């Protein structure tokens, strides 16, 4: 939990260089297990929560708009699995998947895919610095998105903390393994 000036000024903007307000506090959880309690505390204090990874976005999503905000920096959440075959709900065959935490740098996932003889579809120009959580939050794409879709097109499931400070797992059902807008219906299973 950081209230110092250097931490706050380091989280006042992203790649846009827009500057509106300093956050009140910067939170840097050491593990995913800390996330629900941090979110609960922020909500109880009436703070606006701003998740942030590498700060490479050009949409302003990581910029505090008022001083009553808490930036949750996910850069320490760097656990990553191997590319493994997995049967997704509603599919009749295994597909290659990889599990990561939100702070994993995009290039690490691309390297893991390449090591498995595959291509990671999401390739923003900021891949060396951007994080997977931000790729998902901003629906990152890159030049490969034309063929293989964006972050959301390729997302099988994710976990998040709700405003009630509960974990929610969201899984895409009957994934079309292609662009989400090509599917007539996109269905998801929610598990608390």
Which positions does each model-derived feature cover?
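Short hydrophobic alpha-helical runs that function as membrane-insertion/retention elements
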Residues: 50-51, 121
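Glycine-rich beta-strand-to-loop/alpha-helix junction loops that act as flexible
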Residues: 52-56
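FAD-binding subdomain of flavoenzyme oxidoreductases
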Residues: 79-90, 96-192
């Amino acid at each position: 939990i950081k209230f110092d000036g250097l931490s706050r000024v380091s989280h006042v903007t992203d790649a846009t260089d827009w500057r509106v307000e300093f956050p009140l506090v910067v939170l840097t959880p050491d593990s995913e297990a800390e996330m629900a309690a941090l979110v609960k505390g922020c909500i109880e204090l009436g703070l606006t929560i701003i998740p942030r990874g590498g700060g490479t976005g050009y949409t302003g999503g990581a910029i505090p708009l008022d001083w009553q905000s808490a930036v949750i920096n996910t850069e320490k959440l760097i656990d990553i699995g191997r590319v493994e075959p997995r049967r997704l709900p509603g599919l009749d065959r295994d597909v290659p998947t990889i599990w990561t935490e939100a702070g994993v740098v995009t290039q690490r996932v691309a390297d893991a895919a390449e090591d498995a003889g595959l291509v990671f579809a999401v390739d923003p120009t900021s891949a060396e610095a951007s994080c997977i959580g931000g790729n998902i939050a901003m629906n990152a794409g890159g030049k490969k998105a034309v063929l293989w879709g964006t972050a959301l097109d390729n997302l099988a499931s994710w976990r998040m903390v709700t405003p009630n400070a509960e974990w929610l797992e969201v899984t895409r059902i009957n994934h079309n393994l292609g662009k989400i807008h090509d599917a007539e219906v996109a269905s998801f299973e929610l598990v608390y």
